[in-house]
Amino acid sequence: MGGSSSEKNISIKTGNAIIKALSTKYNSICPISISIDNDLSFLKQIKKGDIVFNALHGGSGENGDIQSILELNNIIYTGSNSKASKICMDKHVSKLVVQSEGITTPDWILYKNSKFSKQ
């Protein structure tokens, strides 16, 4: 929980809610507040646990960065894998993937590099 994005405070609230819910059933919960600033020291503590419950919001917590780090270190975690996280963070790409699977999605406009591209 925590992180370095503008959503840090909501991530802490989410983490605290998860801790409260899990503590009714599990005794050994170890909250870890992290900041992805090229500091991977949190990995030593995470590796001691059975599973990581990812409560990070925005930025590295949702864009696949933290998921990639956990995957590279063979750490089990909750939530989407790094590839799905990267795709979903880019709404244009996620809509293209959805369409490629035959799922209808409303038309959209992509604004990129000062130009409009209607899809």
Regions found by a protein language model. Give the residues of each.
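Basic phosphate/pyrophosphate-binding loop/patch that engages nucleotide-derived ligands
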Residues: V97-T105
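ATP-binding N-terminal substructure of ATP-dependent carboxylate-amine bond-forming enzymes
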Residues: M1-K83, I87-V93, S100, K112-K118
